[in-house]
C-alpha cells in the first residue's frame, strides 16, 4: 500500500529535520548522529574502505572501468535498497517505538509483525538471513585480509597460514564480546583502512576520471560491446 509507505518516509524525514533534532544538533548531538550514521553506513556498504575492489580486481575482464561500474552498484543495492526496506519495515510496524528493544530485536519484532507468516516462522526467516549474512561476511573479510597480507609479505604463504588460525580464533572470541566493544573495534579498524585508501583515491582521481571518460567515449563510438 503506497499510503503507509509514504507516511513512513514522511516520519523518517520529519524525525531527521524536526525542531527537536535541529535544536539537539546545535548542542552537538547532530554531530554525534552524523558520526554514528557515517560509521554504520561504512560498516554496511564499505564505501571508501578499499575492500570491495580487492574482490573486483580478481575478475577476468578487458574493461576495468566496466568492472568498477558493476562494483559501484553494490553500495547502492546495500544502502539504498536493503537498508531502506529494513528501515521501512521497522517504521511501518512500529518496532522503533517499542521500549526495551535493541539491535536485532527491533528487526525481529518488525519481521514478526510485518510478514504474513506465523511469528515463529518470521523469526526463523530472519535468523536464517543473519546466519547467511554472517557466514558470507566472515568468508569475504578473510579473503580481503589474506590478499592484503599476501601482498605485504611478498607472497610468503607461511604468514598467511598463521594468520588464518588467528582469524579463526577471532571468530570464536567475537560472540563473547559486548556489542559496544565490537562496534568500537569495527569503527577503529574501518577508520584505519579508510584513511590510507582515501589518500590513494585522491591521488589517483585524475587517472580514474581519464580512464572513465575514455571508456564512455569508446562506448559511444561503438568500440565497446554492451
PLM regions: where:
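Short, small-residue-biased leader/transition segments that mark boundaries at the very start
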Residues: 1-3
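Select transmembrane alpha-helical segments in multipass membrane proteins
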Residues: 21-44, 81-83, 88-89, 116-132, ...
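Helix-loop junctions at the membrane interface of multi-pass solute transporters
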Residues: 41-47, 51-64, 71-75
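Alpha-helical transmembrane segments
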Residues: 57, 138-158, 207-221
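Membrane-interface alpha-helices at helix entry/exit sites of multi-pass transporters
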Residues: 61-77, 155-164
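Membrane-interface interhelical connector segments
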Residues: 92-120
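Extracellular/periplasmic helix-loop-helix junctions in multi-pass membrane proteins
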Residues: 175-192
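Terminal cytosolic tails of multi-pass membrane transporters
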Residues: 191, 195-226
Amino acid at each position: 500500500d503506497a499510503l503507509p509507505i509514504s507516511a513512513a518516509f514522511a516520519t523518517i524525514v520529519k524525525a531527521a529535520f524536526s525542531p527537536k533534532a535541529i535544536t539537539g544538533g546545535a548542542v552537538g548531538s547532530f554531530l554525534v548522529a552524523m558520526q554514528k550514521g557515517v560509521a554504520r553506513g561504512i560498516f554496511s556498504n564499505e564505501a571508501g574502505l578499499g575492500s570491495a575492489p580487492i574482490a573486483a580486481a580478481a575478475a577476468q575482464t578487458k574493461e576495468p572501468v566496466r568492472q568498477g561500474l558493476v562494483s559501484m552498484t553494490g553500495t547502492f543495492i546495500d544502502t539504498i535498497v536493503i537498508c531502506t526496506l529494513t528501515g521501512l519495515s521497522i517504521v511501518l510496524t512500529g518496532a522503533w517505538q517499542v521500549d526495551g528493544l535493541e539491535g536485532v530485536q527491533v528487526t525481529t519484532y518488525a519481521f514478526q509483525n510485518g510478514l504474513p507468516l506465523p511469528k515463529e516462522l518470521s523469526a526463523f526467516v530472519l535468523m536464517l538471513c543473519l546466519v547467511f549474512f554472517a557466514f558470507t561476511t566472515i568468508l569475504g573479510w578473510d579473503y580481503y585480509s589474506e590478499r592484503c597480507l599476501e601482498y605485504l609479505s611478498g607472497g610468503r604463504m607461511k604468514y598467511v597460514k598463521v594468520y588464518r588460525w588467528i582469524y579463526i580464533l577471532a571468530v570464536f572470541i567475537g560472540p563473547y564480546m559486548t556489542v559496544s566493544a565490537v562496534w568500537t573495534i569495527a569503527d577503529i579498524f574501518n577508520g584505519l583502512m579508510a584513511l590510507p585508501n582515501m589518500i590513494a583515491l585522491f591521488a589517483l582521481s585524475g587517472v580514474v576520471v581519464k580512464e572513465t571518460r575514455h571508456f564512455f567515449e569508446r562506448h559511444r563510438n561503438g568500440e565497446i560491446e554492451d
